[in-house]
């Protein structure tokens, strides 16, 4: 697979599908409901929410891929000093997950993975 923003976004959509499928199977009762959305400045995403399950009280697995004009604060940020100060465009995509189980003995899950790039070649992959 060539590493480019479109392939990364497609892989992250597949990751969202895979995670939702596995959680539905593990829960056995509830299913994710999906709402698609668009960002006026460019891009959009899919919000998926599950609630009142056998194991999961409420959870969300969300995907986004947005683009537009690079915010000025990123162009001024010293951490990104290698960025082209005239970089006018950015692209960002990611998946975020928040799961609240029914049992207080089971930990809450909160994680995300994201990819960001700006015109001029600055790009990074992160998560937490």
What are these regions (language model features)?
Residues 1-82:
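Gly/Pro-rich turn-and-neighbor structural signature
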Residues 128:
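Flexible glycine-rich active-site/ligand-binding loops centered on an Asp-His dyad
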Residues 47-125:
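Internal mixed beta-strand/loop scaffold within catalytic domains of large alpha/beta enzymes
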């Amino acid at each position: 697979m060539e590493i480019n923003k479109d392939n990364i976004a497609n892989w992250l959509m597949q990751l969202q599908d895979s995670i939702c499928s596995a959680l539905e199977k593990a829960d056995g009762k509830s299913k994710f409901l999906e709402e698609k959305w668009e960002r006026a400045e460019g891009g959009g995403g899919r919000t998926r929410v599950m609630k009142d399950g056998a194991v999961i009280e409420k959870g969300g697995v969300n995907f986004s891929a947005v683009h537009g004009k690079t915010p000025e604060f990123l162009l001024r940020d010293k951490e990104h000093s290698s960025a082209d100060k005239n970089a006018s465009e950015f692209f960002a995509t990611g998946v975020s997950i928040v799961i609240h189980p029914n049992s207080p003995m089971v930990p809450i899950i909160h994680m995300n993975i994201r990819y960001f790039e700006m015109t001029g070649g600055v790009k990074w992959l992160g998560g937490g």
